[in-house]
Amino acid sequence: EASGGAVHAAPRTLCDQRFVGRLIWCHDPEGNRLEFFCDPEIATEPFTPGRAISGFKTGPFGMGHAVVKTPNVETLVPFYRDVLGFRVSDYALSPIPLFFFHVNDRHHSFAMVGSEARGLHHLMLEYCSLDDVGQGYDLAQLQEGRISQTLGRHTNDYMTSFYTHTPSGFFIESGHGGRLIDMDTWEPHETDCGPSFWGHERLYLSAEQRDTFRDMRLTLARDGKRAPDCPWFQAVTGAR
């Protein structure tokens, strides 16, 4: 409210639908609805997955991450950084604007990508086992057109993942091995190497756009760039 935005208290009916004690909501400058809650109801029954998996990495790291697409990155960054208090992890300006934010030790829990469109780009869920991701990839490939980005590994958070289309028009990223950082010592910085070491072929883009991302991956391969063998050592030494 101090920044000029309207904040609304949710009625009891909505709190009951969300299974939370209290809830407030507002819109970001792009009109995306944000909900904040406390006192969630805790399930007493153990989680039963839809297929045999080892589980999801959540707890103190949250559920994963969410990414929105926007034509006005410069408008959204101050809101999430200065109003909500999210901390910038890193950012890229080319070939498209990308900003990543952390709120805990997960490299990023929120991000935004420059786009002509607005709305949700994707949600990421992190599995406890790489085999969970690989087996899910096999299953997704049984459905024609389901894969939106092939299996690959990201350069900033080291996540090995693939992306799938959803009926609602956004993507789901299924990943493993995401990077943890030290919030007290981390310094935000610009990256220019591209989003992936290998893979993540964006099947939904034009041939020209795909060539741009592929050239960046091939440059990394030529230069011998890869994720560190020991992310913990990298974290404590401050190397990137």
Role assignments for model-derived ranges:
Residues 1-30, 70-74, 125-240:
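Vicinal oxygen chelate
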Residues 12-13, 32, 44, 108-111, ...:
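Intrinsic, low-complexity N-terminal interaction/targeting segments
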Residues 28, 42-73:
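Surface-exposed beta-loop interaction hotspot
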Residues 28-38:
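Structured, non-catalytic alpha/beta "coupling" segments that mediate domain-domain communication
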Residues 34, 89, 172-173:
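Generic structural signal for well-ordered beta-strand positions
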Residues 68-108, 113:
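Core segments of cupin and vicinal oxygen chelate
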Residues 117:
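Long C-terminal interaction/binding lobes of large macromolecular proteins
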